[in-house]
Amino acid sequence: AGRPFLLFLSLVFGLLSISGTGSCTTVVLGWSRDGLSAARIGVLTTGSGVAMLVGAAGATRLSRRVRGGVLLLAATAVTVSATAGLALVPSVPGRALLLVLLFCAAPIMNAVGGGYVMRLIPTGMFGRVGGALLLINLGLPAAAPWLAGRGLDAVGRSGTLWGFTALGSLALGLMLASRRLRTLGLPSQWDAADEAP
């Protein structure tokens, strides 16, 4: 049951990565289309970079104090809510703040999810299985910029953002359906989590 669950996790996190990366790309491309200067876009996205550093710095401390399942689902819910907000909020400052929220929660989600995946890979198969999972996790998000551009041309900014929100919502739903993820404990307890999703 180990390999199917690893594939399940890879799919879920791949969908979340497409959702977040695609939403951010859609917003930036939309700003460029609206005529915002490159300098202003750079300033607006600087907050996202700072937020990612803050989220990464807090991820380790939080993972030691909060159960993995709670932290993972909460961070994922925040990222999905932020992508939905990007579709609902039309203002430039509002979208910039939502990107900050998204990029603050994403490192927490990645830290718990990535750490758990690494724990599940058998030592003797780390190279082969890890390489396959890395291919999936890098390959799926690589499509996000293309999807964002095509979406903007086909259905506009709002429609594209709702599409990426739907992907994130699907991933969140899959996570909620997995008892193994919902009940995931602290990192010290991960070895005991052996039930299939």
Residue ranges and their predicted role:
Residues 2-21, 100:
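Pair of pore-lining "gating" transmembrane helices in MFS-fold secondary transporters
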Residues 9, 27, 31-197:
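C-terminal transmembrane bundle of multi-pass solute transporters/carriers
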